[in-house]
């Protein structure tokens, strides 16, 4: 993958990038680098979401769960991983818990 900056001709003062081709693009996503997220980790995380959807329903988790309950499960999975248990993807389940807490910080801040 080529460095994205080599395509940028100049930075426009109105929050746009202007490319050598003349194309313009807003800079509103410049602080978020989704291209840096590991595709391997993301696949593992998606499998945890799929497993949960099969067991509890597609969006059951979005109804909300107490943070201490999520942390307890995440810590349990982390400890199992530390003990060498590879019977399930414990690290992806820890990541799921952290993603859920971050989601609830925005959607259910009083939990």
Predicted feature descriptions by range:
Residues 1-111:
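Intrinsically disordered, low-complexity regulatory regions
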């Amino acid at each position: 993958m080529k460095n994205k900056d080599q395509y940028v001709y100049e930075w426009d003062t109105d929050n746009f990038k202007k490319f050598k081709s003349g194309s313009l693009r807003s800079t509103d996503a410049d602080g978020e680098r989704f291209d840096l997220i590991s595709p391997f980790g993301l696949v593992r995380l998606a499998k945890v979401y799929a497993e949960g959807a099969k067991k509890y329903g597609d969006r059951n988790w979005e109804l909300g769960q107490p943070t201490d309950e999520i942390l307890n499960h995440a810590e349990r999975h982390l400890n199992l991983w530390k003990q060498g248990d590879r019977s399930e993807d414990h690290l992806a389940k820890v990541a799921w818990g952290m993603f859920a807490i971050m989601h609830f910080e925005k959607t259910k801040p009083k939990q």
